[in-house]
Structures are given as C-alpha cells and as structure tokens.
Amino acid sequence: MQLRQFWTHRELIYFFAVRDLKVRYKQAFLGVAWAAIQPLVGAVAFTILFHGLADVDIAGRSYFAFALLGFGVWTYYSTTLQSGTGSLVYNAELLTKVAFPRVVAPSAALLPGLVDLAVAMLLATVIGLASGGGASAVSLVVGLPVGLLMLVIAVAGPVLFLSASLVKYRDASALVTFGLQFLLFVSPVAYPPEFVPAGWRVLLYVNPLAGALGLLRAALVNTPLPSIGSLSLSGAVAVIVLFVGLLHFRRSELEFADII
C-alpha cells in the first residue's frame, strides 16, 4: 500500500465521507445544530468541574473558550477513532463484492468529524475574542494548519491499526472504549499543560493529542505555544504510529474478504 493511494482515490474517499456525514444527521430533530450544541454543553460541564470546583485557571484568558476548543478536539478524536475502527466491519458487504482499496474506508472516517470540529473552533475563537483574547498572526498561520495536520495524523495511525485488527479480533472495540476513557484524563483537554508537574510534563507530549491541542489553542484562544521540543516529540510519535498503522494494515488487508 502506498501513500499516493489516498490522492488517487480521493473521490471515493469523499463519497464515503459524505455518506457517513449524511447518516450522522439523518432524521435528527436539531440536525447540524448538534455540531454547536455538543461542544457548548461539554464546555459548560468542564467549566463547572475544572474551573469552578477544581480552580483550574488559564492566566487571564477565557477558560470557557479554552474548554470549548478542547472538547471539540476531543470529540473529533474520539468519534473518529470509534467510527474508523469499525469502518471495515461496517462496510463488510462492499469489501466482499466490490474491488477498491481497503484503505479507503478508514481514511474516509477521518473527514466527517472535521465539520463538527470547525464549528467548535469557530465558537471558541468568537468567545475568546469577545472576552478580550486574540492570537497573533504568527500563531494563527503556523498553529492552525500544523495543529490540524498533527491531529489528523494522530488519529489516522490508530484508526488504520485498529480497523485492521477489528476484522480478525472483534474485541478490539472494547480496547478502544477503555483506551479513550484513559486517554481523556491523561490529555490536556480540560486543563492546561502547566497543571502537570514540570518533571512529568515531557510525558504529556508523548501523546500527540497534547501537541495538537497546544497548537490549536495557541492559534485560536491565545494560549502560549508549546516548546519546539514538546511539539517535535508529539509530531514524531504521531508519525511513527501512523507508519506502524499503515504497515499493520498492509499486512492484514489480504485476509479481510476471507474473514469478513
């Protein structure tokens, strides 16, 4: 499997992504309004629990905007990981009847959640500006595209690995559920990296989600940029996991049609 397959079959990936997006909001009473409601409700919960009760502060910046963006990023990561893990099993009938690169299904799962994420980012930016925040042009130009790229890569590797694993081992879905519960607490979703003791902070950035969150928050709600060393660590781990996922997927895909 070669990386150029992603570009060669971009139209098929787009078709799968649009189909999944339509299914998500089909017959929903509030429709796409859920894209705004979910991060707002999540941010309210985080604000009450962490800012109100645990006294987590963001050095004069809007904690609500900080939490809203964190919840939006987390929602993208968790829902994409869950849907991507099941993408091959969900499309089992197509896999056995239609000849197309199997990598299309998990790749398409990376896209629908970006719509909800864009809404959360817009809301966080507006609220941050309204509360007197606002990032520099450099943070915006660098942090936004690099942060989004790191986020997508951070979830793409696990999606490829786990989607291939679920075909053969159906209890892989239970691993995803447990893993996400653990990851939520060890990721700076509702708290800033400074909340973690300095001696342990380097371990925080072994998690690529921490690097992506740091870049996106610096770009949109004007939090300090993480150090180059921290971002390099997160980026390196994300790329390594991506290639491990690609390798595992390539070795497993010949058995997909036979097992499903």
Regions inferred by a protein language model and the residue ranges of each:
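Hydrophobic transmembrane alpha-helices and immediately adjacent juxtamembrane helices
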Residues: 1-260
